[in-house]
């Protein structure tokens, strides 16, 4: 068979082709290959590196797929709310009208006191994001506002915005 140094050289080459290894992981495997006493140890380290590389690739693929799915939900929700006026429907929101303009700016009219519905947003733009914090649900955010509203398109021409309460609005064009 091959000499240990041949096996080691082949292992280095194989290791350098594993593109899904983190830099520190590759470094660690390289170090372990350098000090491996025999061909069996070299093979074992290489097998471990391959497993890590494949796991990293699978994780990266899953993350990319999740991001694509999240983006799709965000885009669909954004399309449903872009250029519409939300008219307060639930009791605490009657008298409140929020317009989400197609250019991503907004207007709000608050004709009620006290206001226990959504408050005056901060910042001049709105957007829909989907992230892990809200378990993959679409969220309405305003550019300078810490408050996020989980969005549920109810399928009956209404939308619910959820923060400390669930605020229901009728969608009108």
Map each language-model feature to its residues.
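N-terminal glycine/threonine-rich, aromatic-flanked beta-hairpin/loop signature
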Residues: 91-149, 160-165
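Acidic, low-complexity intrinsically disordered regions
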Residues: 153-154
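N-terminal helix-cap/turn-to-beta initiation motif at the start of protein domains
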Residues: 69-87, 97-103
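Short, low-complexity, Pro/Ser/Thr/Gly-rich segments in the mature regions of secreted, periplasmic
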Residues: 163-173
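Amphipathic alpha-helical assembly segments used for oligomerization, scaffolding, or translocation
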Residues: 1-75
